[in-house]
C-alpha cells in the first residue's frame, strides 16, 4: 500500500495553466475510473477547485510518473509543461499534504473553511465512481478529523476571510460606499453565495444573481433580497452593474469584450469593477483591456488577502503541529494494518492445531483414558505443534548468521535475555 498526492495549485501554476488542468463536475466520475484503469491505481480521488487540481491515489507500488503522464494526456498538455507546475507528495508527505489542504493551511486565504467542504465533495464523488476503497477511505476520514481538530483547537478560522470576502474587500476599496452600488453575481454555487452574503452585509444597494437555471438563482436570491435572472439576461444587466463577480463551472467564457463594451457605452463609461473567480475563466481576459473596467482574477487577490495572513500566522503554527501529529498517527495505524493479515493467518493456524489436539484428547477420553494423562498429552502436543515452525525457522536463521532476526524473535516472543526455552533447542 502506498499513497500519492499529485497536482498543481495557485502557488505553482498561473490561472491560465490551472484552467487547462481543471476538471468539470461532469468529467469526474469517468476521469476517476479511467485514472485507476490506466495507471494501476487501486484507489483514487480528484479535488478540482479554482485554486488547485489534485489527485489522491493509493497504489501497490508508487508510479507517480504514470499518473503525471495520464494527467497531461487527459488535459492535452505536454508532460514537460505539466511537470513544470506540478508537485508530487508520497507516503507520509502525501498524508500530511491532504491534511494541510483540508485544514486550509495550503489555501490562498490561510484557514479558509470552504476547502474542507470541497474535499468532502471530492470524497463523495470518488465513492460514487467506485474508486475509493478501505485505505483511501481511512485516509479521508483521518483528514476530516484532523481538519476538524485544527478548526476547533486553534484560532485559524477567526476573522473569517475567503476568496469571496477578498473580492468584496477589493470592491469596498474601489467604491467607498457600497450602499450606492449595484452588483451582478454570475453563478449560484458556494463561492457566489458567500459573495452575496458579504455584499448584503455591506449594504450594497441592489444584487442580481444570474445563473444557467432560474430556479437555482431564485433560491440564492431569496436569501438576500436579490433579483434572479438567466445567463441570457446578463448583457442588459451589465449596463446597471457597478460590480460584477463571477464563479461558474462553465468551460467557455460567459462574458466577452463586446458585451462589456456595449454596456460601458450605455453607462457613459462609468467604471465597472469585475472579479473572475472561476477556473476556467468566465470573463475573457481581453475585457481587462477596456479603459473603464477593473478586472481581477483569483491570482490578483493575493495582495488583498496578505493582511489576513498576518492575523492567522500564529494560529497556523499550532495548526501545523496538529497536522503533523495527525499524519504521524495515521501512518502508525496504517503500519499496524500491515500486520493484520499475518496475525489472522497465524491465529487460524493456531486454532487448527488446537482443534486437532482437542479432537485427539476427546477420543482418548471417550476410550476411557485417564483425564490427567489426557490433559497433559493435550498440553504437550499443542505446545510442540505451536513451537515446531518457529523452531525450524530460528535454527535456519541462526545457521545463516542472522543475529538481527534472532534478536527480533526474542523481542517478538517477549523473552528476557538468557531465558531461552529448551523446547526451542
From Swiss-Prot:
Site (Important for activity): 97
The keyword Oxidoreductase appears for this protein: yes
GO BP terms: protoporphyrinogen IX biosynthetic process from glutamate
Bridged cysteine pairs (disulfide): none
Record field: catalytic activity: (S)-4-amino-5-oxopentanoate + tRNA(Glu) + NADP(+) = L-glutamyl-tRNA(Glu) + NADPH + H(+)
One Pfam family hit: GlutR_N
Binding site for substrate: 49-52, 107, 112-114, 118
Molecular-function GO term, any one: NADP binding
Residues that hold NADP(+) according to the record: 187-192
Pathway: Porphyrin-containing compound metabolism; protoporphyrin-IX biosynthesis; 5-aminolevulinate from L-glutamyl-tRNA(Glu): step 1/2
UniProtKB keywords: NADP, Oxidoreductase, Porphyrin biosynthesis
Domain of life of the native organism: Bacteria
The enzyme's E.C. designation: 1.2.1.70
Active site positions, chain numbering: 50
This protein's record includes keyword NADP: yes
InterPro entries documented for this protein: 4pyrrol_synth_GluRdtase (IPR000343), 4pyrrol_synth_GluRdtase_dimer (IPR015896), 4pyrrol_synth_GluRdtase_N (IPR015895), GluRdtase_CS (IPR018214), GluRdtase_dimer_dom_sf (IPR036453), GluRdtase_N_sf (IPR036343), NAD(P)-bd_dom_sf (IPR036291), Shikm_DH/Glu-tRNA_Rdtase (IPR006151)
NCBIfam families per record: hemA
Membership in a protein family: Belongs to the glutamyl-tRNA reductase family.
Record's function text: Catalyzes the NADPH-dependent reduction of glutamyl-tRNA(Glu) to glutamate 1-semialdehyde (GSA).
Quaternary structure, from the entry: Homodimer.
Comment, domains: Possesses an unusual extended V-shaped dimeric structure with each monomer consisting of three distinct domains arranged along a curved 'spinal' alpha-helix. The N-terminal catalytic domain specifically recognizes the glutamate moiety of the substrate. The second domain is the NADPH-binding domain, and the third C-terminal domain is responsible for dimerization.
Protein name as it appears in the record: Glutamyl-tRNA reductase
Biological source species: Pseudomonas putida (strain W619)
Upper classification of the organism: Bacteria, Pseudomonadati, Pseudomonadota, Gammaproteobacteria, Pseudomonadales
